[in-house]
């Protein structure tokens, strides 16, 4: 088995596949990446029984074949080699890597012990890659990282006719993003729960102009995604997220609007005096928003800015990190805050100007916290 591949091409491809490998696999063989060279294509595949990844790369194949190589080690090597073609020669159990004046000899892993990768399920529709990647990043930020509650580490993907709804929560905030997709056949309704980290990693790998094909197994336990030369399958999480339709308020007492960039900068400034897990108070009055951080006996900071308010004045406090996550993921220059009361949950949406209608396709619910003055 012998082939050549551009270093940059290999580094990008093996880097993506290797990220999907378990850091401490339950079975050592799962640390490997299957490398198949045939025709003018190099195919890299990884699998850990939960997630499978596959990418095709252009290569100059002199002798076809298949070998199992330690994935993370190959990724580390490809990352640091000079930017010239890399030559691979495989001789039984040894993999010889040559790049310019640098050479490595790697021990191949036993290919016959490697599990069979799952096939891509039946494609049920497609979505524009740019929109999908942005939507995933907007909701993934609120997914829990606590594996003690696996259901909260997922992103709910709801298919409702020609609308796809992504949603995630960590119990303290809830993000929803709606976007158009093209179902194959008769549009129907279904819901799946996908590991957030896996979905986000695939979204980050998308290239501009990619069309993402979405596939679901008939058993409803496997999701497949295919875009360009990349393919991924992952086992779905069991359970369901809370019903966001019941959590998001239907009626509000006040609506505040403020420029996103000014509020983000102000939050970062006043947060400098805060200890961990402290809150920032937002005092909305007609024409002004006042931010306060710190208590009477602590370091304090205040920032004022122009804002609009419809309805009752609001004096409310939030975790500043949660606010920043919501604000920085708005694709808008203005943020609209919809309040139920000074002690109730708030909903943040983007808008193009102070007088424009809010964009309801991206909604961010955040719970208030107590502020000690």
Swiss-Prot record:
Molecular-function GO term, any one: 3'-5' exonuclease activity
Domain of life the protein comes from: Bacteria
Compartment(s) where it occurs, according to its Swiss-Prot or TrEMBL record: Cytoplasm
Cytoplasm keyword on record: yes
UniProt keyword annotations, A-Z: Antibiotic resistance, Cytoplasm, DNA replication, DNA-binding, DNA-directed DNA polymerase, Nucleotidyltransferase, Transferase
GO terms classed as biological process: DNA strand elongation involved in DNA replication; response to antibiotic
InterPro entries: DNA_clamp_sf, DNA_polIII_beta, DNA_polIII_beta_C, DNA_polIII_beta_cen, DNA_polIII_beta_N
The protein's name: Beta sliding clamp homolog GriR
Organism: Streptomyces muensis
């Amino acid at each position: 088995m012998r082939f050549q591949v551009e270093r940059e091409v290999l580094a990008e491809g093996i880097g993506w596949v290797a990220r999907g490998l378990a850091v401490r696999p339950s079975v050592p063989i799962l640390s490997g990446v299957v490398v198949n060279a045939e025709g003018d294509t190099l195919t890299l595949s990884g699998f850990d029984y939960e997630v499978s990844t596959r990418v095709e790369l252009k290569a100059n194949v002199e002798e076809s074949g298949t070998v199992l190589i330690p994935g993370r080690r190959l990724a580390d090597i490809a990352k640091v080699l000079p930017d010239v073609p890399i030559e691979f020669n495989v001789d039984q159990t040894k993999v010889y890597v040559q790049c310019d004046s640098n050479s490595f000899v790697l021990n191949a892993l036993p290919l016959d012990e490697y599990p069979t990768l799952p096939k891509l399920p039946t494609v049920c529709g497609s979505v524009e890659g740019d929109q999908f990647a942005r939507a995933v990043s907007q909701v993934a930020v609120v997914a829990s990282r606590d594996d003690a509650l696996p259901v909260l580490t997922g992103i709910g993907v709801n298919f409702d006719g020609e609308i796809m709804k992504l949603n995630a929560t960590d119990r303290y905030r809830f993000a929803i993003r709606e976007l158009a997709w093209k179902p194959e056949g008769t549009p129907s309704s279904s819901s799946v729960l996908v590991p957030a980290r896996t979905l986000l990693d695939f979204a980050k790998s998308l290239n501009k102009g990619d069309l993402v094909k979405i596939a679901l197994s008939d058993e409803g336990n496997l999701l497949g995604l295919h875009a360009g030369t990349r393919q991924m399958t992952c086992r779905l999480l069991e359970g369901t997220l809370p019903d966001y339709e019941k959590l998001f308020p239907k009626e509000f007492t006040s609506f505040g609007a403020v420029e996103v960039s000014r509020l983000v900068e102000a939050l970062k400034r006043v947060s400098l005096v805060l200890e961990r897990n402290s809150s920032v108070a937002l005092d909305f009055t007609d024409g002004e928003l006042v931010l306060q951080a710190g208590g009477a006996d602590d370091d304090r900071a205040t920032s004022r800015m122009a804002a609009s308010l419809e309805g009752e004045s609001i004096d409310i406090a939030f975790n500043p990190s949660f606010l920043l996550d919501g604000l920085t993921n708005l694709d808008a220059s203005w943020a609209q805050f919809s309040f139920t009361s000074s002690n109730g949950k708030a909903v943040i949406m983007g808008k193009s100007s102070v007088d424009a209608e809010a964009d309801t396709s991206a909604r961010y619910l955040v719970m208030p916290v107590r502020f000690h003055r």
